[in-house]
Amino acid sequence: MIVCKIPEEVLDQVRLWKAQGKRIGFVPTMGFLHEGHAYLFEECISKADKTVVSIFVNPAQFNDPEDYAKYPVNTEGDLKLCESKKVDLVFLPDKETIYPDGIPDIVLKIPNLMKSLCAVSRPGHFEGVLLVISRLFHFVQPDFAFFGKKDYQQYLLIREFCNTLAFPIEVIGCETVRSSQGLALSSRNSRLSETEKEESLLIYRSLKLGENQIFSGIKNPLLVKEIMKDVLDSSSKIRLDYLEILNADTLDPLEVLEGEILLAIAAFIGPVRLIDNLTLSVPIS
């Protein structure tokens, strides 16, 4: 496994592979890797000839400096996981490498997909995501890029970003990996106590209840949201950020629960903010 810390080394290796006719797959991460990331690596390896993983905690996407400071780091463990999963190259830049002149004063937006969910509750977050992704794509020049659908809005934004700017990259969304009890795997879970982990299971329980209500024939989104919210309100440890039912393609509000549907929740368990979602396909009557 090759480990690179500067973009020129990555570009040189990628160009060599491409000259050999190899297709490049890319999984950008912020490190503290877990089995959810490992699944992305496996999906990448199954489709691409060479797999590149980046590990970089991007300061531009944190609207809370304290959240950035507390983001967990385990570089040694991350490299071991990448090697065990047969990743070909790990790009391990520092902040000065990605932003040599500081974080630039440029704003990247896709307004139609940034009217709700995390774009509202974390202002500036996705602008920072699009900024770093544009730079990483420039450095790695992948044919495929893989993103987990736990961060569903991010996946949609990056896919639309590539389409709008005609990046020759196929953006592939991968299903959320969960614990045996249903908790979506996240690097932030490491900051939860055992009691908080138990309480956090209510997020998935709420989503599944919403799914069941919709498939039982309920068409009113407000009614389903109230039923879902009751589950979360049963815990004094959960502070709801948002609970939304939207069109899964456009993120527009729904008046009738038909077609492609996204159920999305963000909530604080103690000091830790967790997100999760389900997507459903309901026949249009």
Curated annotation (Swiss-Prot):
Pathway: Cofactor biosynthesis; (R)-pantothenate biosynthesis; (R)-pantothenate from (R)-pantoate and beta-alanine: step 1/1. Beta-alanine binds at Q61. InterPro entries: Cyt_trans-like, Pantoate_ligase, Pantoate_ligase_C, Rossmann-like_a/b/a_fold. It holds the Pfam family Pantoate_ligase. It is found in: Cytoplasm. Keywords: ATP-binding, Cytoplasm, Ligase, Nucleotide-binding, Pantothenate biosynthesis. One of its GO terms (cellular component) is cytosol. ATP binds at residues 30-37, 148-151, 177, 185-188. (R)-pantoate binds at Q61, Q154. One of its GO terms (biological process) is pantothenate biosynthetic process. The active site is at H37 (proton donor). GO terms for molecular function: ATP binding; pantoate-beta-alanine ligase activity. Gene3D superfamilies: HUPs, Pantoate-beta-alanine ligase, C-terminal domain. It comes from the Bacteria. Its EC number is 6.3.2.1. It catalyses: (R)-pantoate + beta-alanine + ATP = (R)-pantothenate + AMP + diphosphate + H(+). Catalyzes the condensation of pantoate with beta-alanine in an ATP-dependent reaction via a pantoyl-adenylate intermediate. Homodimer. The reaction proceeds by a bi uni uni bi ping pong mechanism. Belongs to the pantothenate synthetase family. This is Pantothenate synthetase. It comes from Leptospira interrogans serogroup Icterohaemorrhagiae serovar copenhageni (strain Fiocruz L1-130).
